[in-house]
Amino acid sequence: GTGPVADLHIINKDLSPDGFQRPTVVAGGGRDVVSIGRAGDNVTIRF
């Protein structure tokens, strides 16, 4: 989508080795967003 873009730093000591899929709170967001990726990946969040 369009709008502001920010660098996101997601820190979670309990990430499983095969990755993660969890709800992500985005400031100013009014919709549910889920971040999906593997441990150690950069995360792309699409609106």
From Swiss-Prot:
Provide details of activity as a function of temperature. Answer: Optimum temperature is 70 degrees Celsius at pH 3.0 with ABTS as substrate. Retains 100% of its activity after 1 hour at 30 degrees Celsius at pH 9.0. Retains more than 60% of its activity after 180 minutes at 60 degrees Celsius at pH 9.0. Retains approximately 50% of its activity after 90 minutes at 70 degrees Celsius at pH 9.0.
Q: Where in the cell is it found?
A: Secreted
The record's remark on the cofactor is:
Binds 4 Cu cations per monomer.
Q: Which GO terms describe its cellular component?
A: extracellular region
Q: Any keyword Nucleotide-binding?
A: no
A GO biological process this protein is involved in? lignin catabolic process
Q: Which cofactor does it need?
A: Cu cation
| pH dependence, record text | Optimum pH is 3.0 at 70 degrees Celsius with ABTS as substrate, and 6.0 with guaiacol and syringaldazine as substrate.
GO MF: hydroquinone:oxygen oxidoreductase activity; metal ion binding
Q: Which UniProt keywords apply?
A: Copper, Glycoprotein, Lignin degradation, Metal-binding, Oxidoreductase, Repeat, Secreted
Query: Residues in domain Plastocyanin-like?
Result: 2-47
**Record EC number:** 1.10.3.2
- Post-translational modification remark: N-glycosylated; contains 17% carbohydrates.
Quickly give the catalysed reaction.
Answer: 4 hydroquinone + O2 = 4 benzosemiquinone + 2 H2O
Enzyme class, UniProt record, top EC level: oxidoreductase
Q: How is its activity regulated?
A: Inhibited by sodium azide, SDS and mercaptoethanol, but not by 4-hexyl resocinol, L-cysteine and dithiothreitol. Activity is inhibited by the heavy metal ions Cr, W, Sn, Ag(+) and Hg(2+), but not by Pb(2+), Fe(3+), Ni(2+), Li(2+), Co(2+) or Cd(2+).
Q: Which family does it belong to?
A: Belongs to the multicopper oxidase family.
The protein's role, per its UniProt record: Lignin degradation and detoxification of lignin-derived products. Has highest activity towards ABTS, also active towards ferulic acid and guaiacol, but is not active towards tyrosine, vanillic acid, 2,5-dimethyl aniline, p-anisidine or violuric acid.
Anything else known: On the 2D-gel the determined pI of this protein is: 5.3, its MW is: 59 kDa.
The protein depicted here goes by the name Laccase-2d
Which species?
Answer: Cerrena unicolor
